[in-house]
């Protein structure tokens, strides 16, 4: 006779917490029930191994699913160890009491995987079921029992005859509501997709009768055929020996698992054993996803525990600077919280994340050294992320990432590393020269590049918006400071050249002051310079914000009209300087127009906008007319 009992452990309150608070997604219940079935099957298989029970054949150990649309039931059956009355009472009557955890502690065996450790997964069934019925017979026992509960009302246990060894859990699904369509769990395709998503690598066959439409023999008509189908693949690719896996298998797995049409650029398959053991299968895509640089993109690796899917985007497992890496991690050493949906941010997770970061860095370094062509393709697609890594960490990641960076060399006309630049520095060169701009062509034509190139020094081209911000955070490489050729003094002149330049500036002091006065607050200074060779004029920023930074900051949605300190430099060896001297001496009232024209010309060369394009155009026209009078 059935006896009504109440749950232990603050029954209603705790059960409500289990059902309504712990699990984010209701569909998790099927993963939990299948995991419990796998645990029960593990226990029987372990018993057969340790006690030499020949009648138990692993090939017969399956997990069977069935659904009944008419009666709105979903059933999960295992052929595992089963439970007697006391075990049903202990494991199902007491919330958060885990038989699997107890079994694992007692056996201390590495030969068996026990997934459930907290004793609450079973109760997730009540998220979708108004009533749950568990029929079970323990291995070696003649009597079976049925446990029935409608959640907070407690439970009943009664004897049931003629039960097979194992357990059958029958869920009587809730009625549909406006928020939830519980009929989804009576749809064979939805059930198949949930098994594929969460339990594909449970190492026992998960079977279900499925209906498919097939063409009749010798006829154009179709008929429904019911077949018992295995829904899971059981053996994870990452658990196999790397030597036995073909490139095609990795490629197909990646494309199927991560919804990409292209093969990955790089596969990283690693297994680590020790205090924290894990398998990782990582992929570097051939191309960035469409939303890679948008706020919609989520980084993270898929997380498995003993082959059971836990989380799709475990963001803590991958650092921001390697956010382009896709893949998964499978570990039995991670501490999972009570629902298995969210990880506790603990030491094991940190250890795995650190090792994965080092592995990715090592593989990229290897690629750079041994397969330069592929690495340059990688850097073209994802190098920006490495640069952001240094910038966003305020230079803390400099030592980790600086040797992975590539820059275009104006001298070599190809991408080079900072190490390669330093190794090829000329005798007497103490700084790493760089210039910024939108394209290689624009940078190569900058007047400021000319003086450096004239001394046979290489110039690195910075063409990404983040470059100068990153360089500011790095400060130097191998004790060699970075030097912007368009900012401050280049210190390239000899003592004799410096003295000569000082004399020219002194001799033309009143002219230069007049030009500065004409430009008022547009410039902080006007001077002659040896920086220029063939060009008449250029703008140089002071030691604050550079021109490229000005452009980037002002292009931002919250740009605040940032201005770099402008220094107008004039080439004393250019005919334009003689023309200005002549105007100043013979027609001083025109000096304002010449100053304005020179300044606007320098702005245009630098890629900066001029305040009044119409006035600029009119002044050029006036000058052309005047010259032809």
Feature-to-residue mapping (PLM):
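GHKL/Bergerat-fold ATPase module in large chromosome/replication-associated machines
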Residues: 114, 132-154, 174-629
